[in-house]
Amino acid sequence: MLFALALIPVIALLCFIYFNDKKEKEPIGLLIGLFFAGIGSIIPAIIGEAIGQAVLNVIIPYNSVIKGYIFAILIVGPAEEIGKYLMLRLITWKSKHFNYSYDAIVYAVFVSLGFAAIENVGYVFMNGIGTALLRMFTAVPGHACFAVFMGYFYSKSKYAKLTRNGKAAGYTALSLILPILTHGVYDAIIMGARESDFAVFMGLSAMLWIGYVIALFVVSCIIIVKSSRNDYCIVTLPGDLQTVYRPAVAGTWKCECGTVNYFNYCSECGRQRPANNTTWNCPKCGTLSSYNFCGNCGCPKPGPQQA
């Protein structure tokens, strides 16, 4: 009973994320591997938190609200989110299946909910059904929210790397910093309140935490819905037509639905950018394309005199 209660929210969220992948479903084997990688990431998280807590106890040997904040934001958040990110990066960055923007959110959530699953099982078996019901609507969806932020910028980092637009480092930093901060603040509000003896402060902290959790859920759902709706191909597939290009080089195009787009797919209806009737190989890098510019290096399509 407790085991089922611990895993029900995990399974529900995984299904929600998976079935919002409209363009191209990810291989089940890859997703299972990511889930178990997330479970494995709890080991470095435990070690990191133990070391961080030992150091913090030396620096601040007494319990206080400030100590709770520091522990949550500077130790718990980084220890858990960096471990998840490393698993995500090692498994998916060079994967041939990572070819659509929404894929990154799917990958990140599967890793994060693997972590959440094993953590939730432990908490539920230690504290009982009340904890199971509370975490079903807070901690487990919270881990999914942190992963949505991570995946959103992880996808942008991959796209920036492929298109060489100079923004990859910034997006990579955001894919780590934002989950760490949102996770750290989530825990800090709780941990700070636990260290306080003032009922008013504890009550205000509880209200702040509830508002923060609701805001996390709303923003994450908006990102999921928009990312799913605007999902676009981000890579060049060997042997296939060009599927990614620099928006500044390729220019805009007007879809049949009337939407003006920069990217490969219409953000409103999902139609693909119209291709030319003929394909060509880039004379500089050899990439196969059906557009007027090479998406790999930006070289314009050769004219008749160059053919």
For each feature predicted by the language model, list its residue ranges:
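Hydrophobic alpha-helical segments at protein termini of multi-pass membrane proteins
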Residues: 1-307
